[in-house]
Amino acid sequence: MPTPTNTIIKTSIVSNLPANFKHIGNEGTVSNGLTTQTDSIVDEISNKLASSWNTFASSVTFDNAMVIGLGIGAWVGNGVGGIFSNTELSMNATNPFTGGKAGDLTDAINSALNEQFNLWASTYLINGVSFVGTSTALPIVPGVFTANAIPMLISAAGFGTIPIGSGLKIIANLPFITPDLTSFCNAIGDAFESNFNNWLNTSQLNAGSATGPAAPGAGSGFGLSVGGTLL
């Protein structure tokens, strides 16, 4: 499944705001009930998060899982471990206005969401992903195996540190806080986490391919995976 769009993220943020949210700024409202200033900030956050998320998912590879298995002719194995080639989500929302405190807010959001996402990416390991392929080994002659991973949901293929408490992390990064800002930061954190979990549970990881020596007898062998991608 593709990464969440800016529209999906924005809708999630707005839907997580409490009914008594009094908005940031004093301008007139737009169709979703937010003030124009609040709406501009939500647009900036949604656009930058969606863009950076898509860049991560479309460019990252997953490599270096240990693949162990066996087979004469047909070869079957399992992969564990591995690492993403890039563990950096680089969201960079900026202040849509001249001056004011909105820059402190966008900086706090960038820092918290990047930290949360990148902690997951840097700790993610696959666990028992199936690799299937062929082996040239014979009962008395060594050979080589080549195998490809069977794509699995990211959440089922492995595990990493799932983001929690993102709104609180945003709040902790702010040099100032008000009740409305608390609601706003929590709405952003909740929207990020719900979209993150949906992405994990609907998108797939192709853990790549592996090749290596296959011993005579059962054709046992091991190698490191390369070229895994997010689908």
Q: What are these language model-derived features?
A:
Residues M1-L231:
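Extracellular "spike/adhesin" assembly and maturation modules
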